[in-house]
Amino acid sequence: MTEPAVRCTELSHSFGTTRAVDGVDLEISPGEVFGLLGPNGAGKTTTLRMITTLLPAAAGHITVFGVDVARRRMAVRRLIGYVPQQLSADGALTGRENVALFARLFDVPRASRDAEVRRALDLVGLADEADRVAKGYSGGMIRRLELAQALVSSPRLLILDEPTIGLDPVARSAVWERITQIRTDTGMTVLVTTHYMDEAEQYCDRVALMHTGRIRALGTPADLETDLGPGSTLDDVFRVVTGDRLETDEGGIRSVRAARRTARRLG
C-alpha cells in the first residue's frame, strides 16, 4: 500500500482559548495537487505550519511520506519545500543569489549547488533574469523566485501558502502554469492554500474546505459542485459551508506585501 504524502489524524491546536484547528483528519496522495480552502481564520495556515514542523501540534499525529513530524523534524524538513505568506526573497540580492542562499540553507552539496540553482531558476522561467537584482522584479516574478528557493533542494512535497495573493490575473495564471508544469515534470505533491476558487477549480485535483478549524467539505471540485446541485460553482460551495464570500486583491508587489500581511494576521 502506498504511503500518503501527508496524513493528519485528529490534528488540533489552540491559541489561548481559541481553537484554531479542531480535530482535522486528512490524507493527501502522492503526486496530487491538493487545495486547502477557507476564509481568514479558518485554520489553514496553522495546519500548514504544523505539517512543516514550524508549529508543534497540541494534539494529533502527522506523517509526511510516512515520517513522523513530531519525532523526526529534520527528516521531514528535507522532504518539504515551503513558500510561506511572508516574502522570503531579499530585494538587495540577485535572483541567482537568493536561490543560492537557500541552497546553502538546505545543505545542497557544494559540488552540485550551482547546477541545482540553475535548474530551480529554469523550472520557474527565471533563467534569463537570474542576474538581475530582485527588487526590480515584478510581483509575479518575486513569487516565481520564491518557488525556485523552495525547489532548489528537490523536495517531494511543495507547500504553498497563498502563492498568488495580491497578483493580477495574468501573473496568477503564470505562477500556476509553472506549478502545474513542475508537478507534471517531477511528480511532486503540491499542497496549496488559496482564496481564489477559480484557481482551485482549475488546478487542484482535490480540495478540503475549512471553517472554524474543521474540515467541512472534502472531494474533487467537480464532485463538491455536483453534490450542491446543477450549475453550482466552488464559490457556491464555499458560501454554503461558511456563509461568507472570499475577497480578492489584485496588483503588483506592493499589493502582494499588503495582502500577505493581512492574511498572516487573520490566519
Language-model features: where?
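ABC ATPase "signature
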Residues: 218-219
